């Protein structure tokens, strides 16, 4: 059994090495940067189309992006393996280093000789006519300064800031909780993106096919500056579930959280255009995007003759218009404002009555979010406690001399300056 523990201890030491943890953190940060640079969760065909002619960073084609699981970095097997590896490294580091350090800080160490004190990081001696009284005065000064003191005949031990040793343990615990929450959310979470036009609904079903929640878009508005640039867009939603109903408004950076589901205002689009051609009634026709013409170009193709000949292309960039009409040769025929007058197109009067925008909603269900928040809270508390310096001090009174030694895990120079001043204060008080 003893011979078998050697390799296990070496393996545990390697896993808990700080350098390994730093490398893993860098790899996770790099993977997160890749996940930010490459759109996540899109259909596979979109990666093939996007990176077939222009590889990502000049290196990866669409097929390679899919093979390396870069289309879903945060739920990929290799990313979760990195999180598990780092979590194991932090747990082993806490077990092998931080926990023993905390136990050592809580344990009183009894130094009995001045020679032992002289070997400490800080050691000072001061002549003291009455060493017993000097030791008592030192104890009084230390207790007044918030030190814990253990007094024994002709010697004492004191400590302050032992709670700082809890900080690294809490930091490691917070990181592990954070990674567990992230992994749980990646494996058990759901994400859905949909465009809804006002009056339309979206049903969220449970595993049995029963409606869990119905989201209806009552109104959608886009706020623009005087130049027509988008400033904000907001959606008035109605949520209906079993025995409950809720009205709420969401906007960019102001999501709605309800029963474990978060609804974000993510995007906007143009859904339909209401047209009147000649003497026809007002027709509500769907619009579609044309990415080959630009990032935000919507339009539709309309025939102008009963047999479908002489088509025209109508395009828009916003719900405010104008709608620009082109013929098959790309020549501009007319510009129509929503709600404005009609214009003649191919011998027919054409009028745009209205353009209906659609709200882009992002729905996320992430069961790991509470664990992530808890991890961040524990991490912040641990980080704050880690800043607390842990100081230990020993004093021995012998042969007319008061000898003091100390250890400190942080800001040793300040402690080295403070110790002689502490001794001098004891001597002055004794002389007084």
From Swiss-Prot:
Disulfide bonds: none annotated. GO terms for biological process: cytochrome complex assembly. It holds the Pfam family ResB. Keywords: Cytochrome c-type biogenesis, Membrane, Thylakoid, Transmembrane, Transmembrane helix. Coiled coil: none annotated. One of its GO terms (cellular component) is plasma membrane-derived thylakoid membrane. It is found in: Cellular thylakoid membrane. It is a multi-pass membrane protein. The chain crosses the membrane at residues 18-38, 76-96, 166-186. The keyword Thylakoid applies. May interact with CcsA. Required during biogenesis of c-type cytochromes (cytochrome c6 and cytochrome f) at the step of heme attachment. Belongs to the Ccs1/CcsB family. This is Cytochrome c biogenesis protein CcsB.
